[in-house]
Each structure stands twice: as C-alpha cells, then as structure tokens.
Amino acid sequence: MASFGWKRKIGEKVSKVTSQQFEAEAADEKDVVDNDEGNWLHAIKRRKEILLEGCAEKSKQLKDEGASLAENKRYREAIQKWDEALQLTPNDATLYEMKSQVLMSLHEMFPAVHAAEMAVQQNPHSWESWQTLGRAQLGLGEIILAIRSFQVALHIYPMNPEIWKEDLSWARTLQEQQKVAQRIKKSEAPAEVTHFSPKSIPDYDFESDEIVAVCAAIAEKEKTVSANKTMVIVSASGAIETVTEKEDGATPPDGSVFIKAR
C-alpha cells in the first residue's frame, strides 16, 4: 500500500542548471528593455535640444536682419522680423529692448514702454533695458518714473557716463522745469471765490414778533408815500411849482396856463 505524501511542486523537477539559465536569459531581456527605454528617452532629449538650437539659430538670424533693417530706417520691417524671432525665443530680452527703441523712433510711446517693460521683466539685470525703459517713459512725460529707471540702470552699471551725463541729467532738468511751470501756473491762477459756510450766516427767525413788526412798518411807509403823487409844474412864464396830488383825484391847475412835467 502506497504511503500518503504532499505533492511535489513542478518547479522542483526542474534542474538547478536549467533554472539558472532561465534567470540569466530573463536578466538579459530586462537589460535590453532598459537599454531601449534609455535610448528612446535620450533620443527625445537630443531631438529637443536640436530643435532649441535650431530655434535659437533662426532667431539670431532674424534678429540680425531686423537690426540691419532698423539701421536703414525700415522700422516696420525690422519690427516684423523681431516679432518672428520672439515666436522662436520668447525670453530674449534683447529683442524687446531693440523693438522698444524702434517704436520710439516711430513716436509710438505706449507700445515702446510696453516692449521695454517686457525686456526688463525677462532680464532685470540688463542696464540697457532699464535705460531704454527710462527713455520711453520720458516720451510719455513720466519724468519721475524715468528718473527711477535711470537710477536702476546706474545701480547695475555705475560707470556708464552716458546715463549720468545724458539721460539722468536731462530728466532732472525736465523735472525742475516742470516744477517752475507749476509754480507760475499756481501764482497766475485767479483768486478763489470765497464760499460762506452755512455756519457763517446767522439763522434769523423770520416769524418772530420783531421781524414782523419791522416788515409791517416798512409796508406802511411805502403805502403812505405811494398815496401822494408829486408833480412839477412849469408856467408859461417859466416859473416852476411843485404840487402834491392826492389819490382822491384832486384836479390840477388848468393845462392852458401851465405846462405839466412829471
């Protein structure tokens, strides 16, 4: 009679050498998969680098073309080239700064300020961008903001004589002229009309007995004066006589003898 026992696992029938062979093959396949995945990621990264290099190269080409057009005063075409370059390299502060200069040459101050602000935003350590921003702000009449921008540019590059002698000096001169003009305007302004506050006017009680009595006396006096009419009568001989005529219709002297004048 056969004795009862646990069933052996199938794997136990496989020899140790065969098992090791399977494990080695599985490890090789895993290495191949890992290598393929690594190669794929590397290829994507390399392709991205190539695209970025191509964009940067194309952007530089467009930048140079725009600069050449701007030197020949073909400003609109230069702006178009730089806009195309910004599509490829939107973080290039130099493109915004150059665009701002050209817009100032076209007397388009609001877009010039906006472009200079974008240049400062992309590269706040660029003294050229701050200098251009200050000049654009001067074009808008924002003297205080322009002075601040020039001061930032000097803080970045303190040895720049152009900012000291031209930009900042000119901005401060304009500021002094503005202050003088404001003082003159203020001195020539007409005197303001004095406005009385309600508290400065006495609050009379027009229904008091005293006010009513005064009004009644004035009315009675006017009534008495109007009841009498005064006439100046000039006689034919030239004599002048003043006659008071009553309201009851008193008859004046004969008109054939006197000439009546009122």
Curated annotation (Swiss-Prot):
Q: Which UniProt keywords apply?
A: Phosphoprotein, Repeat, TPR repeat
Q: Which SUPFAM superfamilies match?
A: TPR-like
**Which sections of the protein are TPR repeats?**
59-92, 93-126, 127-160
Show the InterPro entries listed in the entry. Answer: TPR-containing, TPR-like_helical_dom_sf, TPR_rpt
Source organism per entry reads Homo sapiens
Residues with the Phosphoserine modification: 197
Give the protein name, as stated in the record: Tetratricopeptide repeat protein 33
Output the SMART domains linked to this UniProt entry. Answer: TPR
The chain residues annotated with the modification Phosphothreonine are: 251
PROSITE patterns for the chain: TPR, TPR_REGION
